């Protein structure tokens, strides 16, 4: 009985790990890449969408939400840039 339970658990773990890999590949292929190195045009309004991974700052410039070097979320980047 323990052997059957162990086999079932192993099969479940294998299916979960392969499922995660497949969904990760799908996510990476859908939508634009997070980092677009072309210059981002400034936004015209504060609530305007700058595109995926960017936010519009008070000075109407588009800034990345994630710092490429440290991969940390920089939601305060607008305040840092304008200070």
From Swiss-Prot:
Cystines in this chain: 43-57, 50-62, 56-78
One cellular component term from this protein's GO annotations in UniProt: extracellular region
Record keywords: Disulfide bond, Knottin, Secreted, Signal, Toxin
Primary localization class, coarse: secreted
Tissue specificity statement from the Swiss-Prot or TrEMBL entry: Expressed by the venom duct.
Propeptide residue range(s): 20-42
Keyword ATP-binding among record annotations: no
Localization (cell): Secreted
Signal peptide: 1-19
A molecular-function term among this protein's GO annotations: toxin activity
Disulfide bond listed as a keyword: yes
Description of its domains: The presence of a 'disulfide through disulfide knot' structurally defines this protein as a knottin. The cysteine framework is VI/VII (C-C-CC-C-C).
Family that this chain belongs to: Belongs to the conotoxin I3 superfamily.
Name recorded for this polypeptide: Conotoxin Pu6.1
High-level lineage: Eukaryota, Metazoa, Spiralia, Lophotrochozoa, Mollusca
């Amino acid at each position: 009985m323990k052997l059957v339970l162990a086999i079932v658990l192993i099969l479940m773990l294998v299916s979960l790990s392969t499922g995660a890999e497949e969904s990760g590949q799908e996510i990476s292929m859908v939508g634009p890449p997070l980092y677009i190195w072309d210059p981002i045009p400034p936004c015209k309004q504060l609530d305007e969408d700058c595109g995926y991974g960017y936010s519009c700052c008070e000075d109407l410039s588009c800034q990345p939400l994630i710092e490429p070097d440290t991969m940390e979320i920089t939601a305060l980047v607008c305040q840092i840039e304008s200070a």
